[in-house]
Swiss-Prot record:
Organism whose genome encodes this protein: Rickettsia bellii (strain OSU 85-389)
Similarity comment: family membership: Belongs to the peptidase S26 family.
Protein name: Signal peptidase I
NCBIfam families: sigpep_I_bact (TIGR02227)
Main location as per UniProt: membrane
Periplasmic side: 65-289
């Protein structure tokens, strides 16, 4: 009887041990799963924070919807702009645009003539413009017969052939050199049947750039709303980023929230066929004839 009792007790102890082991392993597995989930969330949050900090402080992507900088920049070019180039202001910090964390700019660096800059226009603060910087604070800027004069000195301007747009429109192409040596191309609508485009902004009054503000022009001189027209002068505080290079470009846009899923799918093929491979990773400051 003692042996039977001993055997029964031993069997019971073994079962109890196995059950305890199973419970321990299950609890340990659940604990490991919880730890893994927590670690995954921490990693995800860290990645998001790093991505946001890169966008806010270092580099941001911008899509150009208009042709005011044609042919340097075309419609639907996607551009990377460096946020640190001129320091930081309320308007250069993504997601904090209108919170007004501080006044002016911190870590400010001086812009240079010829820089292509993304900024908020004073007359339309809910949007972004991209133009070329021409006039610095204290400068006198004037256009006479389409030629830029800075402080009464004519910049170098040499005709460099014809540019034909994707729509078939012809433009006269000019190589311009600013006083600091920066060179770029500007474009003017070519005559149609010998008739010149009505050039009411090729001759302007003199613009005296105030302290802390800047004068901008679009490279597409006949089709740009810039400092000659409604834009006026742009405060330094409104600068967002310095445009650097094109990372992607298409002739047509794909995404449109108004056309529905089926039409988006149907649009995918022509959109892919419209990719401008020759513009991908193009430096905006390289001169290509």
């Amino acid at each position: 009887m003692k042996k039977l009792t001993s055997t029964t007790t031993t069997l019971w102890d073994n079962k109890l041990f196995i059950n305890n082991l199973k419970n321990f392993m299950q609890t340990n597995t659940e604990s490991n799963n919880n730890k893994t989930t927590a670690q995954e969330w921490k990693s995800f949050i860290l990645v998001v924070v790093i991505a946001l900090m890169i966008r806010i402080l270092i580099i941001e992507s911008f899509v150009v919807p208009t042709g005011s900088m044609k042919a340097t920049i075309l419609e639907n070019d996607r551009i990377f702009g460096t946020k640190y180039s001129y320091g930081y202001s309320n308007y250069s910090l993504s997601f904090f645009d209108f919170i007004h964390l501080f006044k002016g700019r911190i870590f400010a660096r001086t812009p240079e003539r010829g820089d292509i800059i993304i900024f908020r226009p004073p007359h339309e603060m809910n949007t972004r413009y991209i133009k070329r910087l021409i006039g610095l604070p204290g400068d006198k800027v004037q256009l006479i017969d389409d030629v830029i004069y800075i402080n009464d000195e004519k910049i170098e301007r040499v005709e460099s052939g014809i540019y034909v747009s994707e729509e078939g429109r012809k433009y006269l192409k000019f190589k311009e050199t600013l006083p600091n040596g920066k060179t770029y191309f500007s474009y003017k609508l070519a005559p149609v049947l010998g008739i010149m485009f009505n050039d009411k902004y090729g001759n302007t009054d003199a613009f005296y750039v105030p302290e802390g503000e800047y004068f901008f022009l679009g490279d597409n001189r006949d089709q740009s709303n810039d400092s000659r027209i409604d834009l006026g002068f742009v405060p330094f505080e409104n600068f967002i980023a310095k445009a650097q290079f094109i990372w992607f470009s298409t002739k047509i846009t794909w995404w449109d929230s108004d056309i529905g899923v089926i039409n988006l799918i149907l649009k995918l093929k022509p959109w892919a066929e419209s990719i401008r491979f020759n513009r991908i990773f193009r430096n905006l400051y390289s001169i290509e004839d």
